[in-house]
Structure formats: structure tokens, C-alpha cells
Amino acid sequence: MSSMTKERMQKALEQEKVISAEDHEKVRGLAALVKSPRSFIFKDPDYYGMEGWYDLTIPSDDGIPLEAWYIPAKGGESNKLVIFNHALPMCRAGFPGHFGAPWNGLDDVEIDFVLQYKHLTDAGYNVLTYDFRNHGQSGAANGGVCGIGQWEWR
């Protein structure tokens, strides 16, 4: 573990001590009320004919595996890279609201990030995109609760 990573981990542990156990449980309770089911990978780069892409697993500092895709620029590698983070409650493929319940509780639309990756790779960018913990195919952590950055940086 690098010294920068150790410093960040120490800072996170110190911040966690500042939040009372009671407040922490209140936040967990509120999060459980609005927690939506995990989005799933309903499309991959093959859908739009992207070539040379592959799955990879990114190990995090706390051991939770983050599942990802690396998609090279059309025509081969370039020196440009976009790291694409998805929004909540989505995954690296997007949002499957168009599949109906239980995902259409938020909205019944499809949000297609894979098409955006196609535009980026066609424009000469390599794309690295991954599922946040507790989303898509990445590992579960923190009781399935999203910390909105409190834990995810690890």
C-alpha cells in the first residue's frame, strides 16, 4: 500500500470516528428507504460493434473488487483516456428502467452509457469504465449502502 493510500485510509478512519454511531445508523436507515435494486449489465461494447475491449477487475484498497471494461479507441490505442464514472443508481452500462419493475421505480427510461463510449472511442479516446461498489457487477460492501464518496474512494 502506498504512503498516499495509507494516509487516505487513516483520514477515512479518523473521519468515521467523528460521526456518532447514532448518526451513522440514521444515515443507514435513510439510505435503506431510497435504495434501489442493483442495475445490471444490459449491454456491452459488442452491442455497438466496438472491438478490442475487455473485462477487468480493479482491486480496491479494502479488498472489494470493482468490475470494469477497458475499451480502446477505434483503430487502436491512443494517448487519450476517459475514465467514465456512472451516476447513482446506475452501472457502467447505464440504467435499465425500460425493463420495468423493479428498475422503473425511478423512471421507465433507458440510459445508455455504452453508446456514449462508442462516440468517445470513435473520436479517438480510450475508455475505462467501472461499476461502483454495490452497483453492477462489482463487489458488495458497507452492508450494501452507498456512502456517496465516504467509502468509495478506497
Which residues fall in each region the model found?
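N-terminal targeting or regulatory segments adjacent to alpha/beta-hydrolase or S9 domains
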Residues: 1-47
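Short acidic, glycine/Ser/Thr-rich loop/turn "cap" segments at secondary-structure junctions
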Residues: 32-34, 95-103, 139-144
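N-terminal cap/lid segment of alpha/beta-hydrolase-fold proteins
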Residues: 36-81
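Histidine-centered divalent metal-coordination motifs
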Residues: 67, 86, 135
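Short, surface-exposed "cap/lid" segments of acyl-processing enzymes
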Residues: 73-123, 127-129
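Alpha/beta-hydrolase active-site loop
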Residues: 112-116, 145-154
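Glycine-rich "HGGG/HGxG" loop immediately N-terminal to the catalytic nucleophile
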Residues: 118-119, 134-146
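A charged, solvent-exposed segment within the mature domains of Sec-exported extracytoplasmic proteins
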Residues: 130, 135-138, 152-154
